[in-house]
């Protein structure tokens, strides 16, 4: 399973909000909803997040193996 928990931690550390993502990254509210629900987003969205937050993928996404 893909988790965006690191994204929210990175945003908090940087003082960024979802509004920041919408304005600076041109990320739609529906995409933010998908991120909050740990649903799939495009690689273009991941790239935009990295640019807006000046971070790497490891700072916004993590892979959690499915349980047995």
Q: PLM ranges: what are they?
A:
Residues 9-10, 34-35, 61-68:
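Short, charged recognition helix plus adjacent turn
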Residues 12, 37-40:
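Short amphipathic helical patch at the helix-1/turn junction of helix-turn-helix
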Residues 12, 23, 51:
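Alpha-helical residues within the helix-turn-helix
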Residues 31-34, 45-48, 59:
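Residue-level recognition of specific faces of alpha-helices
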Residues 39-51:
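Short, basic-rich loop-to-helix N-cap that marks the start of a DNA-contacting helix
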């Amino acid at each position: 399973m893909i988790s965006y928990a690191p994204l929210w931690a990175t945003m908090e550390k940087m003082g960024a909000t979802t509004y920041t993502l919408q304005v600076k990254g041109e990320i739609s509210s529906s995409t933010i909803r998908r991120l909050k629900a740990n649903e799939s987003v495009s690689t273009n969205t991941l790239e935009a997040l990295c640019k807006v937050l000046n971070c790497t993928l490891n700072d916004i996404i993590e892979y959690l193996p499915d349980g047995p």
